[in-house]
Amino acid sequence: VALVEYFGALGGLLTNGYVTNCEAGVAISGDKILIKGVFDKLVTRMVEKGGAIRGYDLIRSNKYYPFDTSRCENDLQITPWDPEAFKLSADELMAEHGVKVYFYTQFTEILKEGNKVVGGVIENRSGRQVILAKRVVDCTGAAAVAQMAGAECCGVGRKGSMTLMFRVGNVKNVVPSYKPNVKEIPYGAVNFFPLIREGDFRVEMTRYIGSENSAEDYTKGTIECRRQCQEVLQYLKEHWIGFEDAYIIDTAPTLGSLAQPALVGEKKMTQEMILKREMPDDRIAITAYGIDLHSPEMGGQNFLYYLTPGEYYGVPFGVVVPKSPVENLLVGGKCVSTERDAFSSVCCSAISMATGEAAGTACAISIREGVNARDVDIGMLQQALVKNGVLLDPEPAPSVEKYYV
């Protein structure tokens, strides 16, 4: 197995974009655990290193609480982690399972025989190389490989919200908070989250409107958001008690974008499926994050809908399978097939890992069984996922006094 990574660390935006926590309602909902598998293996390693706190343990320890609940979250079992602990844990997992990792490498060209993907061209400091592959999984976050392969994708070139996370230190006597309708800054809201070390926070308060497919937008957005970081810090110093002596530790290596293209799959995750809490028979994962819409024209979140703690829904296998006749390619992560209003529900950290794990498992089974990746037996896939610790039905979470404050 080969893994091609553009950055120098695995984890995508979770390490390179400073998305330093798993949101409440993604892996845990109320008294139920929803996502384990690879995600849980990573969290377990990070916890052992002192680099993460599970959501239910965070609440039971009363660390960083009470939260400001103006976002109306009804379940605050957030799992924060240290990006460095994540990087190290991911490296260890790859080494233990014999995965060949290519850091600082781009996948630049697809190789096909007819409609079958058979590998690709990669480029890095060693020049151009070819990797032949029996199966390919696109977890680029932008459906980049799927587009190269000729799979139909939606949202290509669409503009949307971009943000550059940054970390601040020396914050005193303050709790994580959210305040909407803040006109003094481009993001339009106060939004910051705890890091593992007391006094350190991750701030999500910069904003640029651009396209995932535009290098110019990424460049301009990075420059503008980096400038905004200083502006935001000054705003917090002047208006938020506890930030008087705060300073910027660093800014994330890359922007995060909500405007990336997505696969047009055999099935599509829809808002209706979430609102009805559907549990399809071909599900490959379960989760509970609600609907979180950001308008390019307005700051912060514009529409938030949370499920009741303990509720959840399933994600079908068809969202990782191209509708186009492209064989031996599956898609995982935040570019799986969704309608726009459902994107926020399946792009979060743990569920992105879950769909990626399912796509990879399906590819492995299809090779063993001698079938195309899209034609893998669903029962066989689900059995393999469960054997590897994936949850297709919830299991009880350790009890907490309450899920919110």
Enumerate the predicted regions with their spans.
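Flavin (FAD/FMN)-binding glycine-rich loop and adjacent Rossmann-like elements that form
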Residues: L13, L34, V38, D57-S61, ...
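N-terminal Rossmann-like FAD-binding beta1-loop-alpha1 element of flavoenzymes
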Residues: V1-L3
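Conserved N-terminal/central alpha/beta ligand/cofactor-binding core
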Residues: E5-E109
